[in-house]
Each structure stands twice: as structure tokens, then as C-alpha cells.
From Swiss-Prot:
Keyword tags: Cytoplasm, Disulfide bond, Electron transport, Redox-active center, Transport
Domain Glutaredoxin: 19-119
Highest taxon, organism lineage: Eukaryota
NCBIfam families linked to this entry: GRX_euk (TIGR02180)
Primary localisation category: cytoplasm
Protein name: Glutaredoxin-C1
Disulfide bonds: C39-C42
Family: Belongs to the glutaredoxin family. CPYC subfamily.
GO CC terms, sorted: endoplasmic reticulum; peroxisome
Localization annotation: Cytoplasm
Pfam families xref list: Glutaredoxin
Amino acid sequence: MGSMFSGNRMSKEEMEVVVNKAKEIVSAYPVVVFSKTYCGYCQRVKQLLTQLGATFKVLELDEMSDGGEIQSALSEWTGQTTVPNVFIKGNHIGGCDRVMETNKQGKLVPLLTEAGAIADNSSQL
């Protein structure tokens, strides 16, 4: 199944449509990871989120008919051209290094908890 857009480059209007689609996806889930199945950095981020007990939505761009367009739209929107591209509660976090650094600083779990991706068990301690 081919792309809905002709050629390799999207028009400004086509880009706007795909950016809006990406924004709708990001706003629909507490945590979104734009990924590719063969990407080791993507695997690290997904593994970390799983180990932390987070619920998250993964979009494997290499398995989507419009994955290339979505990645281009993410680049246009966030300035980040690579995957993984992670969003928490609608906010752009970044790629693997940024997610790992945020976790190392002790800031990732609170972000995930605030987003509702991890159950807040602090009242049960």
C-alpha cells in the first residue's frame, strides 16, 4: 500500500495535514513513542518504559504506509529528525539520550505518573 502523497516531498498543505495527524495521535495518549522496529535506541526506550511499568502507545513508522510522512512531519514540528521520538502528556521529550537522561535525573517517573501512564502508588506506601 503506497503513500497518500505523491512523490518524495510534501507540499505545505500536505505537511500541515500530516503534522495535524501526528498532533492528534500525541494528544490521544498519555505517552507516545514514534519508533522503528529495527532501531536499537527505540528498543532501549521501549524497554525502559516497560520496566518502569508505564503504559504507552508505540507507532512503528517502518510498518506504517505513511510512516515516512509522519517522520517528516515530526521533524517539521519538533526539529528532531530521528527516532525514537517520545511525547509525554502532549509534551515533546525527545529521543533516547534525552529520555535516558531524564530518567537518570529522577524526572521521568514523575512525568509518567503525572501523565497517568504509571499508577500513583505513593498513597499506599
